[in-house]
Amino acid sequence: MWNGRYNTHDYIYGTEPTDFLREHAANIPAGGTVLCLAEGEGRNAVYLAQQGYRVTAVDSSDVGLAKATALASARGVHINCLHADLAEFALGEEAWHGIVSIFCHLPSAVRQPLYAALGRALTPGGVFLLESYTPAQLAFSTGGPKDVDMLVDAATLRRELTGLQFSLL
């Protein structure tokens, strides 16, 4: 699905990071290692690399990752790209100063084990940044998944992000 969507000359979500990431990236320890989940065409990963982070972008679309690599090159930075399915991806232990999930909507069967591994994957003082649609998005005819199982609200986050201290913004 995503290879077909990204298979265009244009960057379907643009080449600039989300406003949320611009506002909150500085919460990640400076110069640290950052993992971007379901990064697609790379706009957020490239921004983080431009801020001095060592960035790994993981996505199931090799087409998206090729565009991410091209964008990084055009901006004079490097990102490490990993082609992987998040259902099978191991986050590692104390491997990341930051994990970024920008509109990475996953079915609960994939999301729950991934979220359960976040606390172990972050270094002490590490930060998880999440920007996501909530079930309220279904009332609108704009973007996002149409399957409520792929959307999260505050109660879902409190239940699934066990072992993490977090703030809802």
Q: Language-model features: where?
A:
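Conserved SAM-binding strand-loop segment of SAM-dependent methyltransferases
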Residues: 75-86
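A short SAM/SAH-binding and catalytic strip from SAM-dependent methyltransferases
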Residues: 96-112
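A short glycine-rich, Lys/Arg-flanked "PGG" loop and its adjoining helix->strand segment in the class I
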Residues: 112-124
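Short alpha-helix
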Residues: 149-169
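Conserved class I S-adenosyl-L-methionine
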Residues: 1-29, 136
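Conserved beta-strand signature within the Rossmann-like core of class I S-adenosyl-L-methionine
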Residues: 125-133
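Conserved SAM/SAH-binding beta-strand->alpha-helix loop
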Residues: 61-63
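A short acidic, Gly/Pro-enriched loop at the edge of an enzyme's catalytic core
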Residues: 87-98
